[in-house]
Design a protein with these regions (language model features):
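An aromatic- and glycine-enriched ligand-binding surface/loop that stacks and positions planar moieties
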Residues: 22-91, 193-194, 213-417, 555-557
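C-terminal substrate/ligand-recognition segments
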Residues: 104, 108, 365-499
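Long, intrinsically disordered, low-complexity segments
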Residues: 20-21, 114-117, 280-341, 455-465, ...
């Protein structure tokens, strides 16, 4: 998108902060003074805008997105091209099968990126506190809340992956033991509950100004997610808020509080379900009223940065599509033919009455015809790839030559273990191997629009981390789990009817088509909600946590080893490089930071 948040580094202010916030009292950065600079709200905006820099690494395959997507049932990354592409020393095989260890690349990168993001937030909070008197009370409170809430999101990502983390609210080295999951959860909830009521409430007048920034909707959505997953994080009503004051808003069960937070978002009137599902993933999607928090993208090469292996650009469509898509669409960046769906995952789109198929049938699209329903978020009913008349959420079928609807792209420059060079490219659902797959194996996620003009190297589509649709489904699930309220309080909303109708937009009566395919939501079970969340939020970084919440994470396709099924696998191991740098306890002579129990002998 063209509209950008100010991420510019306020170099002068941060230079003054140095390695310790105490240096701020000792340095005078010429004329004007720091006090003068902090009295100008534009400078405060520039300073605070830096907190969003690290979140731009979230959706990379070597970052948080890759870690949580390839370990859930929705995603897979397999070596192709004779094992020459996407091998990476067996890294993806370990992720696919839940046999990872503490030296995994993305495991290390996620730790470093999120910790650095949280530390920067603490540094900026320190500056705001030191120069509080230079700002009006309103300006100080507004930006302090914005930074504290964003810090909570960085720590949430870290917490979601590792459980035990070095949570701190001060700009200083963390010297104590890692906090236990229930204590981290309590701190996150307390911070968000404190700030949420005072955050900006989005409306049409201020939507553009608050786009890509933390808002009240952001805070309550993250709170709802924390409450919904509290038990999955190991929290009970008896072990939370032991070391931090319980928020006055907290009352009843975790699910009661999830409902309350969802209602705060719903009743704000800030957000609206888009009538077109694919508009949320369009090239220019910044006007989506469904977006609660987004990573603001710039598909051009400026502002391009690498954090070790991780890039701050959206590349998901390029990671998944076959090599031939680059030539068909004329994209600037190569398409890398890596990520795909686990075949069994796509059964959530199975048509009613569809015949039972064998795993061999996954490799024959003619046998797959009629297997999937008309839900546009799925593979669809055509299975003709680039010759499809409609847009479908998962790509299955042929890859045509550019400018042709009949001639197929030929795999001339790559090696396939069973298909000779020059084989016509037809993508199928099946995956033949986790160590040396066919180039055509696996359905590819197709919902993010790709630039077909040769203008943008990377995705110009903004990445919506939180969507309003998630809030509606979280409330329904929380109610089914015993939270206050009724399912009908959601299903009678006009936005909810729009949500289910758009999934079957190609049908004459979309809302009825949804009910015919999946039943009446008012009669759904929790398993029905899980399936729908898979359909709605594929590859949007929610599925792993959903599966953990449902106690199904370690029973997905390709996870078969006894070690992979251990309960500890709901967390990733703390990176080896982190433990190596741990401070030493002077009394015991042992490292203060220790590995998560169950991973000690990696």
């Amino acid at each position: 998108m063209k509209k950008k948040i100010i991420y510019t580094f306020a170099t002068a202010l941060l230079a003054l902060s140095g390695a310790s916030c105490n240096m701020l009292d000792e340095v005078n950065y010429g004329n004007p003074t720091v006090e003068d600079m902090m009295s100008n709200e534009e400078n405060v905006v520039m300073l605070v805008g830096q907190i969003y820099a690290n979140v731009k690494y979230t959706h990379d395959h070597w970052g948080y997105w890759g870690l949580v997507t390839t370990t859930a049932d929705e995603g897979l990354c397999v070596p192709r091209n004779g094992g020459n592409d996407w091998n990476d020393g067996g890294y993806w095989l370990k992720q696919n099968t839940h046999m990872w260890d503490h030296r995994g690349d993305a495991i290390k990168e996620v730790w470093n990126i999120t910790v650095n993001g949280a530390v920067l937030c603490n540094q900026i909070i320190s500056i705001l506190n030191d120069y509080k008197d230079s700002m009006s009370e309103e300006v100080y409170a507004q930006y302090l809340g914005e930074v504290e809430v964003m810090r909570s999101y960085y720590f949430y990502q870290l917490f979601d992956c590792f459980g035990r983390i070095p949570y701190t609210e001060k700009f200083e080295e963390a010297t104590g033991p890692l906090l236990e999951p229930q204590d981290v959860w309590s701190h996150l909830v307390a911070t968000l509950e404190k700030n949420a009521p005072n955050m900006a409430v989005v409306n049409d007048a201020n939507r553009a100004a608050n786009y890509g920034r933390t808002t009240q909707g952001f805070a309550y959505t993250l709170l709802a997610r924390l409450y919904l997953n509290a038990e999955g994080f190991g929290c009970t009503l008896d072990n939370v808020f032991q070391n931090v004051e319980k928020p006055e808003q907290f009352s009843g069960s975790f699910y009661d509080n999830c409902v309350r937070c969802c209602d705060n978002v719903i009743n704000s009137g800030s957000y609206k379900i888009e009538s077109d599902y694919f508009h949320n993933f369009a090239l220019f999607n910044e006007d989506s009223k469904e977006a609660i928090f987004s990573i603001v993208e710039n598909g051009l090469t400026d502002d391009e940065h690498d954090y070790s292996k991780v890039k701050n650009k959206l590349r998901i469509p390029y990671n998944t599509h076959h090599y031939g898509i680059q030539y068909y669409y004329g994209t600037v960046l190569d398409t890398w033919n890596g990520f795909c769906a686990r075949p069994e995952f796509l059964d959530i789109f199975k048509a009613k009455g569809a015949k039972t198929l064998s795993k061999d049938d996954w490799f024959d699209n003619s046998k797959m015809l009629g297997y999937y329903n008309t839900d546009l978020r799925g593979p669809g009913t055509e299975l003709k790839g680039t010759s499809n008349k409609n847009n479908w959420g998962w790509f299955v079928g042929q890859v045509n030559k550019k400018g042709s609807e009949t001639e197929l792209y030929l795999d001339e420059d790559v090696v396939d273990k069973d298909n000779p060079k020059g084989t016509p490219t037809v993508i199928h659902v099946g995956v033949s191997s986790l160590t040396n797959a066919h180039n055509f194996d696996g359905a590819r996620l197709n919902k993010w629009e790709m630039d077909k003009t040769g203008t943008y190297k990377y995705c110009e589509n903004d990445f919506h981390i939180f969507r309003y649709a998630d809030v509606l489904w979280m409330k329904i699930e929380a109610v089914l789990r015993g939270g206050a309220g009724s399912v009908s309080s959601v299903t009678t909303l006009g936005d909810f009817r729009a949500l289910i109708s758009r999934s079957f937009a190609y049908d004459p009566v979309p809302e009825q088509a949804f009910k015919d395919a999946y039943g009446d939501v008012d009669s759904w079970t929790l398993d029905d909600v899980l399936a729908e969340r898979g359909r709605e939020f594929s590859w949007e970084m929610t599925r792993r946590r959903d599966l953990i919440r449902y106690d199904k994470y370690n029973s997905i396709q390709y996870v078969t080893d006894a070690k992979a099924k251990q309960a500890v696998r709901k967390w990733f191991p703390i990176p080896y490089s982190v433990l190596e740098k741990s401070l030493i306890d002077e009394k015991t002579g042992q490292k203060i930071w220790t590995q998560t129990p169950g991973y000690e002998n990696l």
